[in-house]
Curated annotation (Swiss-Prot):
It comes from Campylobacter jejuni subsp. jejuni serotype O:2 (strain ATCC 700819 / NCTC 11168). The lineage of its organism: Bacteria, Pseudomonadati, Campylobacterota, Epsilonproteobacteria, Campylobacterales. One of its GO terms (molecular function) is uracil DNA N-glycosylase activity. GO terms for cellular component: cytoplasm. This is Uracil-DNA glycosylase. It is an enzyme of class 3 (hydrolase). It comes from the Bacteria. The keyword DNA damage applies.
Length: 231
C-alpha cells in the first residue's frame, strides 16, 4: 500500500506565528512529533483534530493582536468535536459540559446569555489564543498523544509569549494548567487561576469572574477588551 505523505510541514500556519516559532520547529522534540504523526497517519489511525485544523489556534488568533491565552489540556477525542481551539466545538455540535460551565460563568460574570453554539472562533479572532497543551489525539483515546512532545512545544509558546510580549492575560483552569504558571512572568502579565470548568472538578469554577477581570486588566494596559458574546 502506498504511504500517505501528510506531514506537519505541509499543514498551514500563519506566517507571523511560523516565524515566531521557527526555532521550535527545528528542535529534536518537534522532529519527533512529526515522525510520530506521520507514523500514525500511515497506520490509518484517526487523529483529531483534522490535519488542517491542528494549528487553528494560531491561524485564527493574530500574533500581533494577542491579548489572552486560555490553556486547555488536549483535544476532544470524539468525532466532529475537536477544531484546534481549546474548549471549542464546531457549530451544530452538542456543547460539552466544561464549555457549558464556561458559558454559565459568562452569564454570572457579565450577564451574557449562554450561547447555542460552542464555536469560540470569534474569541480567537479578537486575540484570544485558545491553546491546548497537547495538539492532537487518537480517536476515542483521551491523552493518547501525551508522550509525543507536544507539551514541550506549548510550554515554549507560553514562555516565549511571556518573554516577548507584555500585558497579556493567562487563564489557567485546573491543576494541569496551573502548573504552567512557572513559565509566566507575573510582573508583566495577569495570571488568573481557577478550578477546571469540568463538572467533575471538586471546587467550583463558577464565580471566578475571569472574563470581567481580564477585560478590566486589558483596559488598564490600554488594550481593547474582548467581546465575549459568541457570534
Amino acid at each position: 500500500m502506498e504511504e500517505i505523505t501528510i506531514n506537519i510541514d505541509k499543514i498551514k500556519i500563519n506566517d507571523d506565528w511560523k516565524e515566531f516559532l521557527r526555532d521550535e520547529f527545528q528542535k529534536k522534540y518537534f522532529l519527533e512529533i512529526k515522525k510520530q504523526y506521520l507514523n500514525a497517519i500511515n497506520q490509518n489511525i484517526i487523529i483529531y483534530p483534522p490535519a488542517n485544523l491542528i494549528f487553528n489556534a494560531f491561524n485564527l488568533c493574530p500574533l500581533k493582536e494577542i491579548k489572552i491565552i486560555i490553556l486547555g489540556q488536549d483535544p476532544y477525542h470524539q468525532p466532529n468535536q475537536a477544531m484546534g481551539l481549546s474548549f471549542s466545538v464546531p457549530k451544530n455540535v452538542k456543547i460539552p459540559p466544561s464549555l457549558n460551565n464556561i458559558f454559565k460563568e459568562l452569564q454570572n460574570d457579565l450577564n451574557i446569555t449562554p450561547a447555542k453554539s460552542g464555536d469560540l472562533s470569534s474569541w480567537a479572532k479578537q486575540g484570544v489564543l485558545l491553546l491546548n497543551s497537547i495538539l492532537s489525539v487518537e480517536a476515542n483515546k483521551a491523552a493518547s498523544h501525551s508522550s509525543w512532545g507536544w507539551q514541550e512545544f506549548s510550554d515554549a509558546i507560553i514562555h516565549k509569549l511571556s518573554n516577548e510580549k507584555s500585558g497579556l492575560v493567562f487563564m489557567l483552569w485546573g491543576n494541569y494548567a496551573k502548573n504552567k504558571e512557572i513559565l509566566i512572568d507575573n510582573t508583566k502579565h495577569l495570571i488568573l487561576k481557577a478550578a477546571h470548568p469540568s463538572p467533575l472538578a471538586r471546587t467550583g469554577f463558577l464565580g471566578c469572574k475571569h472574563f470581567s477581570k481580564a477585560n478590566e486588566f486589558l483596559k488598564k494596559v490600554g488594550k481593547i477588551p474582548i467581546d465575549w458574546k459568541i457570534v
